[in-house]
Amino acid sequence: MATIFDPIKLGDIELKNRIIMAPLTRCRADAGRVPNALMAEYYVQRASAGLILSEATSVTPMGVGYPDTPGIWSNDQVRGWSNVTKAIHGAGGKIFLQLWHVGRISHPSYLNGELPVAPSAIQPKGHVSLVRPLADYPTPRALETAEIADIIDAYRVGAENAKAAGFDGVEIHGANGYLLDQFLQSSTNQRTDNYGGSLENRARLLLEVTDAAIEVWGAGRVGVHLAPRADSHDMGDENRLETFSYVARELGKRGIAFICSREKEGEDSIGPQLKQAFGGPYIANERFTKDSANAWLAEGKADAVAFGVPFIANPDLPARLKADAPLNEPHPETFYGKGPVGYIDYPVM
């Protein structure tokens, strides 16, 4: 039976193992949200992953919500990412760019004084990440129906720029309470147009963005990231199994490369149902160990497993897992911020 160390084909991509590096925001980009040499070194250190899913990368300046996260809308950003992908490919790795719009999870200080946008003008609970002094999230501005085409186009251009930058494919960030998730889940979408109300309407934007990426890349080089638990950024849905199963089925009809779901083990996990509904390669994510990951593969609950924090602290994670070697302890105080400390200085075996 397959283990996480065995190769797999996800869509059009052949992977050397099933150990996926999960998307991890690290806030190390240069001015203008341009990827830099430090980021290239960080990813190269982790090129032994079967596939790297890049940190979330904004498709438009109005889609940012954190300091020093990268973008993919400018020529300078494309050039910066090109250096990253060349280095990763030189080290034998493969990488998809995660395309991102934060929606309401932002603040005017990141948006040139503008309000964040969202499906509906519903203020999220909580404080803006990494802004001091602490500031509540503002009430966002509801997007006009006519503006939604521009959002889809921003994702399309982001997908085109990702191709120009040399990525192996793209992953649509539809998780964790960001814009596409806000449209999808019932608690954050009170629209009465074609993008709200029914489940089909709430899922429309995510699927139209996915279709735009498919037009650029082909379905075999597009993945989608989901988070059915709704445990980030004040989310919630009236029937998460129905909602996310519908999305999985629709994505399955499109034949995309994979879905990756932040849906950890547990009696309430709907990961196996999503895999069945999707019918294609399913990447499980969150708090998996070597043993639990292999168990999910053996039980047919997943086809690959994405690791997040373990990859932060262990650049050589696949080798450590295979050797049953001890793992480095992560240092959360350096997860976000400038410089190499806690970024490229974790030891390898």
PLM regions: where:
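Flavin-dependent oxidoreductase catalytic cores
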Residues: 1-349
